[in-house]
Amino acid sequence: MNNDKPRRGDDDRLLYCSFCGKSQHEVRKLIAGPSVFICDECVELCNDIIREEMQDRLSSGKSSHLPTPHEIRDILNQYVIGQNHAKKVLSVAVYNHYKRLQLGKKNDDVELSKSNILLIGPTGSGKTLLAETLARLLDVPFTIADATTLTEAGYVGEDVENIIQKLLQKCDYDVEKAQTGIVYVDEIDKISRKSDNPSITRDVSGEGVQQALLKLIEGTIASVPPQGGRKHPQQEFLQVNTANILFICGGAFAGLEKIIRDRSKKGGIGFSAEVKSVEDKRSMGEVLQAVEPEDLIKYGLIPEFVGRMPVVATLDELDEAALIRILREPKNALTKQFARLFEMENCKVEFREDALRAVATKAMELKTGARGLRSILENVLLDTMYDLPSMDHVSKVVIDESVVKGEAEPLLIYENQETKAASD
């Protein structure tokens, strides 16, 4: 019945840790190697030593490589078109966050709080791309979570701690690395409280999720199953401290501009009709820049959650000119990506100016922003990309407005031959 008696080796001798000298019944576990043993306490001590050395090495190595806000913004400019105000806000917030990690342990007098970020902007305005680019620039683990799939613990759906598990997966379960990562929570506006009044029924995907997320964002020790998860339930859970993980939450917040306008109208004293007319002339981007915490609370975010998102950056709706620039200018612009694909077939592709304008117009009509540009171009080039590998001597493909509108086929230019239409 009682299993507390010390186990013995094959020769009936007690086994001892080769490092600290404790016997096997003085420790929880004794791990055997070729003619040596190590106990769980010594393993933990070794882990602590390695962890401290890694932190010192990371802090000393990164301090000289942390880009300044100007440098961060310059790199964002290479990948994201427009959104200058949001880039400036993000550059400062991210710089301060990682500077805080480097200097946090060196200053005992002042404790620097974490500044999580809330991005507000329409679909396809670049919220996710900004967060992805920041993580790539800083070389830190990055994961995206969809707030609409999250529920409170115990209900059908994803538990909020699954977010940390995804972050761990991105860095091969390196806990130290994960604890300095970036988490982007998309569609955060979809978990707003359903009404201003507290509900009698359980709101498992709204306020409840906000409360659960709040714990992660504030900083908690999250228990995450190791690799293998449920397949190996006997494994001990990994403990991840979320205090230094940067959370960036993004959402379209449809209807928020109306709340802001209503608040602004109430603020006017007299001449209300004149104030109203001035308010109505502002663009959605200008209105959103005037957002206050009370507007977000009225929208449905709980006050505690809003309080943990001190940095708010608003993104403008992209106009046709911005979409054309997105197609052509960024480092990984779509036209450059398709040009590379065609190069692999020893062929060039030319997008004429009117074609880019037609693609941008179509994206504006679909209200998909920059997100819809790729699918439009994929549809336009589908037949050409299907036929091209089977065709010989095609040196160039020309796309113009009529091709985008579906009124004509792309123009194919052959080597040492007369130009032909794709329909020939």
Swiss-Prot record:
Species: Nitrosococcus oceani (strain ATCC 19707 / BCRC 17464 / JCM 30415 / NCIMB 11848 / C-107)
UniProt-listed GO biological process terms: cell division; proteolysis involved in protein catabolic process
One GO CC term, this protein: HslUV protease complex
Nucleotide-binding is among the record's keywords: yes
PANTHER family tied to this protein: ATP-DEPENDENT CLP PROTEASE ATP-BINDING SUBUNIT CLPX-LIKE, MITOCHONDRIAL, ATP-DEPENDENT CLP PROTEASE ATP-BINDING SUBUNIT CLPX-LIKE, MITOCHONDRIAL-RELATED
Chain sites annotated for binding Zn(2+): 17, 20, 39, 42
Binding residue positions for ATP: 122-129
Residues covered by the ClpX-type ZB domain: 5-58
UniProt protein name: ATP-dependent Clp protease ATP-binding subunit ClpX
Gene field: clpX
Native organism taxonomy: Bacteria, Pseudomonadati, Pseudomonadota, Gammaproteobacteria, Chromatiales
Residues of the signal peptide: none
Family the UniProt entry places it in: Belongs to the ClpX chaperone family.
Purpose: ATP-dependent specificity component of the Clp protease. It directs the protease to specific substrates. Can perform chaperone functions in the absence of ClpP.
GO molecular function: ATP binding; ATP hydrolysis activity; ATP-dependent protein folding chaperone; protein dimerization activity; unfolded protein binding; zinc ion binding
InterPro entries registered for this protein in UniProt: AAA+_ATPase, ATP-dep_Clp_protease_ClpX, ATPase_AAA_core, Clp_ATPase_C, Clp_protease_ATP-bd_su_ClpX, ClpX_bact, P-loop_NTPase, Znf_CppX_C4
Quaternary structure and interacting proteins, as annotated: Component of the ClpX-ClpP complex. Forms a hexameric ring that, in the presence of ATP, binds to fourteen ClpP subunits assembled into a disk-like structure with a central cavity, resembling the structure of eukaryotic proteasomes.
UniProt keyword annotations, A-Z: ATP-binding, Chaperone, Metal-binding, Nucleotide-binding, Zinc
